[in-house]
Amino acid sequence: MGALFGDKRIIKNLSPLIVGGGHESGLRSGTQNVSGIVGFGAAAQLVKNCLSKYQFRMLGIKNHFFDEVRRQIPGVWDNGSYDRVNNTINLWFKGADANAVMTAMPNVCVSSGSACQSAVPAPSHVLIAMGIDRTAASESIRFSFGNTTTDEEVDQAILELVRAVGYVRAINGVALHLGSEIEVNNRAQSA
């Protein structure tokens, strides 16, 4: 069961997946699924009734996550704008390769790109299109929260993230301090 909403000029050019019968202007064949239609309507009403509460909760989780990460990890920037979905945040961890950080925290499910590009190892094309340079994009991680995400899971993710970013930066000789600029211990220069 689903719904199709769009510009009539585009919809009129669509072809049905299954032909036969003339339901829904020829786009759907067969007898209408009455119980599916009723269920879809009930689901839509449930979303309408709960959406504000869900969005408020997701915003609270995301803000708590970002506030704690920023408090505990130096050199963190939010790549997004204020006006965005409430359940997702993309953060740049200066001096910490995103893939290395993700590998160092196997119990936390995150991505270095958009959901549709999760298997692509290159920096996020979305971040590049936003004007973020390739280095910053390759050090950026996308965090998403859902309806079943608990406060305990968020706090555990923060702990693992703090450890993982610190570990990756230490391996790379990057030392950051809260409230200060980046200091890089370049082994090649000291040799």
Question: Predicted regions: what is each one?
Answer:
Residues 88-142:
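Conserved C-terminal alpha-helix-loop-beta "cap" of PLP-dependent enzymes
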Residues 14, 27, 111-114, 144:
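Thr-Gly-centered strand-to-loop micro-motif
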Residues 124-191:
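PLP-dependent enzyme catalytic core of the Aspartate aminotransferase-like
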Residues 11, 34-37, 44, 62, ...:
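A general structural signal for well-ordered alpha-helical segments in protein cores
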Residues 74-79, 110-114:
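A short linear hydrophobic-aromatic micro-motif
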Residues 7-11, 94-96, 148:
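Short loop segments at secondary-structure junctions
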Residues 44-67, 77-85:
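Structural signature of PLP-dependent enzymes
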Residues 1-25, 29-42:
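Active-site PLP attachment segment
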